[in-house]
Design a protein with these regions (language model features):
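Conserved alpha-helical substructure of the radical SAM core
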Residues: 3-150
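Glycine-enriched alpha-helix->loop->beta-strand junction motifs that scaffold or abut catalytic
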Residues: 134, 156-159
């Protein structure tokens, strides 16, 4: 099995497993069924690119924040000096992140893991992610910055 086919099959398994675990949550099931259709289309775009000699991964990791509110032992971002207590002046703006999200979707990317620093520090980028409902954005967070308003936003924009 070629790498592109293997990765596409992995995406199918993710959706199958998520659907099984969401049987009692109708809102989640609707989201997953819609997303599964979109992911099949993305898989086709990846296979077409692969046939032309360009490999497009189904998953990307986007370090959207340079600041974090914690100092966790073993933090990879602090160890690599990509995370600090305040933002870098060169941090990419939310509009550009939104453009990158749309470009990734057009190529056939299915998931963009939002990491950092602490990604909840960048509500502006989270809003841009919500504007690209065709992609799924797992958020790698320490969870300490969740507010009731933010939880409502995540519920409203399930991607």
């Amino acid at each position: 099995m070629e790498l592109a086919e293997y990765l596409n099959e992995s995406v199918v398994h993710i959706f199958r497993d998520a659907t099984r675990s969401s049987k009692l949550n109708l809102k989640e099931l609707r989201f997953l069924h819609r997303a599964a259709k979109i992911q099949k289309e993305a898989a086709q775009r990846r296979l077409q690119s692969d046939a032309l000699g360009t490999s497009v991964p189904p998953f990307l990791i986007a370090s959207i924040a340079t600041r974090c509110n914690l100092h966790c032992a073993g933090c990879y971002a602090r160890a690599n000096h990509t995370c600090m207590d305040q933002s870098f002046k060169e941090e990419m703006d939310a509009k550009r992140w939104g453009e990158l999200f749309r470009e990734a979707y057009a190529l056939g990317v299915s998931f963009i893991l939002l990491a950092g620093g602490e990604p909840l520090e960048r509500e502006d980028v989270l809003e841009e992610a919500a504007k690209t409902p065709e992609l799924i954005f797992p958020v790698f967070t320490n969870g300490t910055l969740f507010t009731p308003a933010m939880l409502k936003r995540f519920d409203r924009h399930r991607n």
